[in-house]
């Protein structure tokens, strides 16, 4: 029932029927099949085949978690971390993540690494974060590969090693992880751990930008603005600044404001410039505050 539910939920090998998938998961879960309990929780969390119900999601995640199922433990932890269907409790999230991480669950290891890095729900421990990221990264988990790259880049929990940072960013970027793509672009832009190459930097920024990553959209806009790694194109600069600004990215709001103020790549509009500067300024952007 659980396997058939998987096929019906995804439409892989059978016509997609999410409602029927939920029925099958429910039957399997009530029959004691632990993976189906977690799958049913996911359906309730995402509203797949059933009305979204975060409390029911937590209920089924908990049932699978208490049976020792690592994905269920991880999903329950994330609910605690985000306050979805349950009161937010970072310490409870850590307890469940520890259980899943001990079973080698890469996602749990990576999220637990984030909490150790930030000291959320547990003591701040950069060395432990590095260890957890390494365990997850070696299993091919892109968020952990990116985080591990950053540890090597800045020397957090380990000795600084820019070359290793590039290696891990590249592994995550190859799996289309947007932040890793952007970070790899930064390495190429500034020659950190790799030979400086503005063209490659632009290529990586564009890959991340097309996946909606605001910092990369802003960086790509700046490259078009100044003709770095690409032919100068003020209109394209505005286009990319707009995309990042729409996501509330302060640097892009400020840069776009200047385009409107000066009429570069877009029709001059001082009122729009002021609005954008204010949006950036209210988020603490010193450039936005100064321009405003």
Region locations from a protein language model:
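Short helix-capping/linker turns of helical repeat alpha-solenoids
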Residues: 1, 10-12, 17, 30-33, ...
């Amino acid at each position: 029932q659980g396997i058939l539910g998987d096929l019906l939920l995804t439409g892989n090998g059978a016509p997609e029927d999410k409602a029927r998938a939920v029925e099958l998961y429910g039957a399997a879960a009530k029959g004691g099949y632990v993976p189906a309990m977690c799958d049913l929780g996911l359906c309730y969390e995402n509203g797949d085949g059933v009305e979204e119900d975060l409390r029911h999601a937590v209920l089924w995640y908990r049932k699978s978690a208490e049976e020792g199922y690592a994905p269920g433990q991880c999903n329950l932890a994330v609910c605690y971390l985000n306050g979805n269907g349950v009161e937010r409790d970072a310490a409870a999230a850590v307890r469940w993540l520890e259980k899943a991480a001990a079973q080698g669950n890469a996602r749990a290891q990576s999220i637990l690494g984030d909490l150790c890095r930030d000291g959320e729900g547990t003591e701040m421990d950069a060395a432990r974060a590095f260890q957890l990221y390494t365990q997850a990264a070696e299993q091919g988990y892109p968020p952990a590969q990116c985080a591990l790259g950053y540890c090597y880049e800045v020397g957090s929990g380990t000795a600084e090693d820019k070359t290793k940072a590039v290696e891990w960013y590249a592994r995550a970027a190859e799996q289309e992880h947007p932040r890793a793509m952007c970070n790899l672009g930064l390495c190429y832009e500034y020659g950190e751990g790799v030979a400086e190459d503005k063209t490659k930097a632009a290529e990586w920024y564009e890959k991340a930008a097309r996946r909606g990553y605001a910092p990369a959209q802003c960086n790509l806009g700046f490259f078009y603005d100044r003709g770095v790694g690409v032919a100068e194109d003020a209109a394209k600069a505005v286009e990319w600044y707009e995309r990042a600004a729409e996501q509330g990215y302060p640097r892009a709001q400020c840069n776009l404001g200047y385009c409107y103020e000066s009429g570069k790549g877009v029709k001059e509009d001082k009122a729009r410039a002021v609005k954008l500067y204010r949006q950036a300024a209210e988020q603490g952007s010193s450039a936005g505050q100064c321009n405003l």
